[in-house]
């Protein structure tokens, strides 16, 4: 398994709409395994393939406290949304930024697992929010898109400043 590089906002590749997985092959399973390792390495609770510059409809999630219950969602689809919720969200592709985003409180989701078997599940609370957040990535959408232009610009400026600082440190 390999740790993949996570793209950061405002990288245009994060805006790419992911294509469906035609067939779950050993290559797709390796992508899934690498994504799980990357999610754990980055200390995230979810990761969409788009975030690692792979434009396929693949998501991995693990909201367990023990960090050993990864969920694999290939070609995920939200079948139903119910209620309203929202928490302050963060994102591996927008490091250091958090914002309250309105989401459905409960969702019904259909996806394929790592072996290509279709399954359906109900999600609420953090899992429902995480699923919606990650599926947004597959559509080329980020949580900052829900914010006002001013807040989005502030986040972009902050990330640019951090990037310049890191580059200066590397060149020193």
From Swiss-Prot:
Keywords: Hydrolase, Iron, Metal-binding, Protein biosynthesis. The active site is at residue 134. One of its GO terms (biological process) is co-translational protein modification. The keyword Metal-binding applies. Fe cation binds at residues 91, 133, 137. It is an enzyme of class 3 (hydrolase). PANTHER family: PEPTIDE DEFORMYLASE. Belongs to the polypeptide deformylase family. HAMAP family: Pep_deformylase. Removes the formyl group from the N-terminal Met of newly synthesized proteins. Requires at least a dipeptide for an efficient rate of reaction. N-terminal L-methionine is a prerequisite for activity but the enzyme has broad specificity at other positions. This is Peptide deformylase. It comes from Vibrio campbellii (strain ATCC BAA-1116). The gene is def.
